[in-house]
A protein has these predicted regions:
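Extracytoplasmic gate region of multi-pass secondary transporters
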Residues: 86-138
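Hydrophobic/aromatic end-of-helix segments at the C-terminal termini of transmembrane alpha-helices
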Residues: 102-114, 143, 198, 202, ...
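C-terminal transmembrane helical hairpin of 12-TM major facilitator-type secondary transporters
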Residues: 151-198
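A late C-terminal transmembrane helix in Major Facilitator Superfamily
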Residues: 207-239
C-alpha cells in the first residue's frame, strides 16, 4: 500500500523494484550468515541473529519519520463489508494465496532438494538452492522494474504462471538432479512477478479498497506461504 500510495507514474515498476530488494536481501543474509558461521563457529548464531534484528528496527525508526500519502484521500475508502462481497476481491485473494504457495514451497524446500538430489552438504545446498532461487527471483523483479515492457501486467502474470508450472514439472520429473535444480532456479524467476503483480492489479482494479484490502491480500499470501511448504512436506513424508 505504501508504493500504491506514492504519487508516481509507473507503480508496477516501483512495486517490482521494491520486492526485488527482498530477494537480494535473502541472498545477502544467506551468504553473510554462512561466512560468519564459518569464521566464528555455529555457537555464534544467536549473536548473528541479534545483529540481523537491527535491520527491521532501523526500518521502523526510518518509517516513523516518513510522510505517507493515503490512497483513500482521492478515491474514498470502501467499507470492508462491501469489499468482502466483491467476486473480484476473492479472485485476487486466490491469486495471492497461489503466489505465496508457489514462491515459498520451492524456496523452503530448495536447500533440502539440493542436498538430497546432488548429495551435497547443507551449506552448499543453501548456496545452490536458496541463493539461486532468490537471486533469479530478484533478477526477474529488477528487470520488470527497469525494462520498459509494454505487455500488460495481466499478460505477464499468465506467462509467469505457465512458466512456474513448467518449472515445477521440471524439478519433479527431470531425469538428472542438475536439471531438477535448474527447475528450482526457473521457478524463482517465474514467481518473481506474481506477488508484486497481484498487489499492482489490486491497486489498479480496486483503488478504493484501502488498507483493509492490502491487509487481506497479505494475509492470503502468508497463508499460502505457510500452507504450501507444509502440504508438500506432508505429501513427501507419506511416500
Amino acid at each position: 500500500p505504501i508504493i500504491e500510495a506514492c504519487p508516481a507514474p509507473n507503480k508496477h515498476s516501483l512495486m517490482s523494484l521494491m520486492h526485488s530488494f527482498y530477494c537480494f536481501g535473502t541472498v545477502a543474509v544467506v551468504l553473510v550468515s554462512t561466512l560468519a558461521l564459518r569464521i566464528f563457529g555455529s555457537e555464534s548464531w544467536r549473536v548473528i541473529a541479534a545483529i540481523w534484528a537491527l535491520l527491521p528496527l532501523g526500518n521502523a525508526l526510518f518509517f516513523s519519520r516518513v510522510p505517507i500519502y493515503s490512497m483513500t484521500e482521492v478515491h474514498g475508502s470502501m467499507p470492508v463489508k462491501r469489499l468482502l462481497s466483491m467476486p473480484l476481491f476473492w479472485a485476487l485473494l486466490m491469486l495471492m494465496f497461489a503466489a505465496g504457495a508457489c514462491e515459498m514451497s520451492m524456496s523452503q524446500w530448495a536447500s533440502a532438494f539440493a542436498e538430497s538430489g546432488l548429495g551435497v552438504s547443507k551449506t552448499v545446498g543453501d548456496l545452490l538452492g536458496v541463493c539461486m532461487f532468490s537471486l533469479l527471483m530478484g533478477i526477474a523483479r529488477f528487470l520488470r522494474s527497469r525494462v520498459n515492457v509494454k505487455t500488460s501486467i495481466f499478460s505477464l502474470m499468465i506467462g509467469c504462471g505457465a512458466l512456474c508450472a513448467a518449472s515445477y514439472l521440471l524439478a519433479a520429473l527431470a531425469p538428472h538432479p542438475a536439471l531438477a535444480l535448474l527447475g528450482c532456479g526457473l521457478c524463482g524467476f517465474s514467481v518473481g512477478i506474481l506477488w508484486p503483480g497481484v498487489y499492482s492489479m489490486a491497486g489498479e482494479l480496486c483503488p478504493t479498497g484501502g488498507t483493509a484490502m492490502f491487509a487481506f491480500l497479505a494475509l492470503a499470501g502468508d497463508i499460502g506461504s505457510s500452507g504450501g511448504p507444509t502440504l508438500i512436506g506432508l505429501i513427501a513424508g507419506s511416500h
